Amino acid sequence: MNKKALALSVASVLTYTVPTMPVKAASNAPTSVSDSRTAGLISSCSLSISSGRKQIYIAADIKAIESMKSIGYKNISIEYSSDKVNWKKEKSIDDLLKSGSSYYLNNYSVSVSGGYYYRVSLTHYAKESGLFGSSQSVPNTSNSVWID
């Protein structure tokens, strides 16, 4: 009987003194670089450029968690540099906005002077519908390309 009582005592002591470890459920959602840069209305966004003859081609993408009153790109600036360090604005482009849940630019062409490295800076933007709809902005800068 003493052995049974001792075993029960040890079992109860271990049960109440061993710390429990919190468990977090694994997420099935895929992770990507864009996920870490966004929160809220915008679920992903990207920006890159390629070179052409005296022009650059912009490829940009923005996706929202649902349909938005306004989604797209604001404060679009074409910048140039001779050293990839000191950037100057060559031109601005009007905002590109529409309603919906995504907006994709595929080889959006912009003429440039040439003789420099070029890049694009813009703000990915989404605004909800409704009187008190919130908005989200994510600034982004593209890679740079040389244009003769």
Please give the residue ranges for each predicted region.
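Low-complexity, Ser/Thr/Pro-rich intrinsically disordered linker/stalk segments at domain junctions
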Residues: 23-148
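Sec-dependent N-terminal signal peptides of Gram-positive bacterial secreted proteins and lipoproteins
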Residues: 2-24
